[in-house]
C-alpha cells in the first residue's frame, strides 16, 4: 500500500485508508483543553475523543443517527429519578458497568485465594436502608415466595479471621420481579436492610429466594434491546455491599445456580464464584431454603502491599 493511500487512524497507529474527512479536526478539539483542566480528565479525554471521533468517521454516522442517540440519552435522563437510573441501565445492557467493575476491582494478587468477587451495583440501590438486628427478616407484606435463611461470615481474606462491625447492605426483588421502589403495592424498604456483624463475624437474616426478572424495558434500554434482538432477563440474584472499617468494601451479587438465565444475564454480571446453591431447609418454620455464603474482604493495608488500585481508604 502506498503512502498516498494509507494513514494512521489516531487510535492505535494502525494503517487504514485515508479518510475523506478533515484529518486535523480531532486534534483541534483535543488541543482546546486548558492548562487548569482536571488532571484525570486531561489524561483520559484525548483517548475518548479519538475513539469517539474515529467511530463516527469509520461508520459514517449521519446527523439523524447522531440525534437518535442524543434523544435516547435525553429520554434516559427524563426517566431517571431517585427511584430509577435509566442512564445506568443503558450502560448495563452494553456491558459497560460490568467491564468497569472488572477493571476497578481486579486485584493484583498471585495467591490461590482472593477476596469475594465483585459485581455491578445496578440502578436500584437505595441509600440508608433500615438497620436490622441479626436474625430479622427483610420481607414485609409478602406471602408468596420461598422464604430463605441466609447466613455466613465476613472474613479477612489474608488471615481468615472474622471481621467485627462489618456492614452488609442487602436488597433484592419481590416474587413479581420488582424492587420495592418500582412497585407501589410493596411497603417502603421491603426486601432491603443493613446488618452489622459481631465479634464472630457472623451474619444471618431471612429473605426470599430470588426469581429471575426482566430489566425495565419501557424506556431507552428496552428499546435498544429490541433493536438488538436481545432479551431483557436477569438471573435470580441478591445484591450486597459489604464494608468494614479498615477494609476495602465490595459491591457484589450472588446468583441462583438453578436459574435458567444463569448463562445469559442481560447485563453480563454473573461470575462463577458468585453462583450459589439454595438448599432445602428443615426444622425452621420461617424458611423453606437455606443459603450459606462467606464474604472475604481485603484490608487496605494488604491492598497497598499488593499495589491494588483503590487501596486508599476514603470517607463515605
For each of these PLM feature ranges, what is it?
Residues 6, 10-316:
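Beta-strand-dominated extracellular/periplasmic modules and repeats
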